[in-house]
């Protein structure tokens, strides 16, 4: 029997505490057959829909895939407004948020440094992209991370996840939630990797 790894860390975004918990519930075996399928095996758009579901379950509202203005930097270093796509705008307890979402697939190894660097780069990129959005609310970068474990490292799976999640807990100024189920952790791809669970990272752009 594997060990379950499951935690939420709201950090400074206390309003999202319930959203994180509801999101974890949507990852559980009640909704998915892990032997053949799991939500974290899908793309950013599909995962964003489950995040929206968690918001609605938390008595909030969500508006996805909308056209919006976005700022970009010209070669001359000036800011120029153009049209773009917003991933999700949502509200909780009279506070509004507008976000940029990304997805990444870090490789888990005996040492977690490289996987954590992949996550750090991804959330920083999402946070930077969020800075281009209009001030419809607090601007957030969101990352859905689906870690993958090579079949050669399967005997050390729990040990590797222990090290990885310990590193997650040390990430600064980042709202986090993760779920690696204990049962039926057998989602194996044809690429020689296992996909044991998912991490959600959220970081606010405060500029």
Positions of predicted regions on the chain:
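Conserved catalytic cores of phosphodiester-cleaving nucleases, focusing on short active-site segments
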Residues: 87-109
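Glycine-rich, aromatic-bearing surface loops/beta-hairpins
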Residues: 137-207
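Surface-exposed cleft-lining segments at the edges of enzyme active sites
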Residues: 33-37, 71-75, 104-115
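Catalytic cores of nucleic-acid endonucleases
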Residues: 101-162
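Glycine-rich, often proline-containing surface loops adjacent to acidic residues and nearby aromatics
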Residues: 25-26, 96-98, 140-142
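A short acidic/basic microdomain associated with nuclease active sites
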Residues: 56-81, 87-91
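Hydrophobic, Leu/Ile/Phe/Ala-enriched alpha-helical segments that form helix-helix packing faces
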Residues: 19, 23-27, 51-55, 59, ...
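Interdomain/boundary linker segments immediately adjacent to catalytic/signaling cores
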Residues: 1-57
């Amino acid at each position: 029997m594997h060990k379950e790894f499951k935690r939420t860390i709201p950090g400074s975004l206390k309003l999202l505490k319930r959203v994180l918990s509801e999101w974890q519930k949507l990852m559980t075996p009640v909704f998915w057959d892990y032997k053949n399928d799991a939500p974290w095996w899908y793309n950013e758009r599909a995962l964003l829909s489950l995040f929206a579901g968690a918001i609605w379950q938390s008595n909030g509202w969500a508006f996805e895939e909308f056209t919006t203005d976005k700022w970009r930097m010209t070669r001359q270093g000036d800011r120029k407004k153009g049209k773009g796509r917003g991933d999700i705008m949502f509200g909780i307890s009279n506070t509004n948020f507008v976000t940029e979402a990304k997805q990444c697939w870090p490789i888990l190894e005996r040492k977690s440094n490289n996987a954590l660097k992949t996550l750090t780069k991804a959330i920083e990129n999402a946070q930077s992209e969020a800075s281009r959005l209009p001030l419809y609310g607090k601007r957030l970068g969101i990352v859905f991370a689906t870690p993958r474990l090579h079949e050669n490292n399967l005997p050390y799976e729990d040990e590797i996840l222990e090290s990885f999640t310990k590193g997650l807990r040390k990430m600064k100024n980042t709202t986090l939630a993760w779920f690696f189920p204990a049962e039926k952790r057998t989602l194996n791809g044809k690429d020689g990797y296992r996909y044991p669970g998912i991490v959600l990272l959220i970081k606010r752009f405060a500029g």
